[in-house]
Amino acid sequence: VTPEQLRELSHAGINRLSLGVQSLSDAQLKRLGRLHTAQEAVETVYAAAEAGFRNLSCDLMLALPEQTADELEQTVSRLVQLPITHVSAYLLKVEQGTPFAVQHVAECCPDDDTAADLYLQAVEQLGVAGFLQYEISNFAKAGFESRHNCKYWHCEPYLGIGPSAHS
C-alpha cells in the first residue's frame, strides 16, 4: 500500500487500519512467503500514522518455524515502539493440504509447550508495553479495543460493509 492510498483511505473516513505485519524478522517473513520485509512493514506503519490513522493494529504470528524466544522478543520490542494501538497475536497452525503442510513446515515449528511459552512471552511483553489483553489473541491500549469484536462478544448489533462482510 502506498502513502497516497493511505491518505485516500484516511480522507474517506476509514478510522481503523489493521496491517498484516506477522513478524519483524526478515528470515521469518521469507519462511512465511510474505512479500514484504520488516523495514517495509515498519515504513508502512509510519506512513499510515502520517496519513492520519490514530487507530492502527498490527497482526503478529507466533510459534513460527524455527522461532526462538529471543527472535520473538526482538519482534515484539520493535513492534511496540511503533505508533500502533492494537496487536492481534495468533499461533501458526499448519492445516493439512495447505502449501505449508506439503512443504513440511510443521516439522520446523515449535512443539506445543514451546508455542505456549512463546504465547505467554508475547502476552507479558505486550502487557508491559501497555497493551491490555481483552481477548485470547487481542491486545490494545486503553480505549482502542476492537469495537466490532466487543459488540460481537456482548451480542450487540453491528453492520458489516464490504466484500465478505456480514451483519
List each model region and its residues:
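C-terminal scaffold of the Radical SAM
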Residues: 1-167
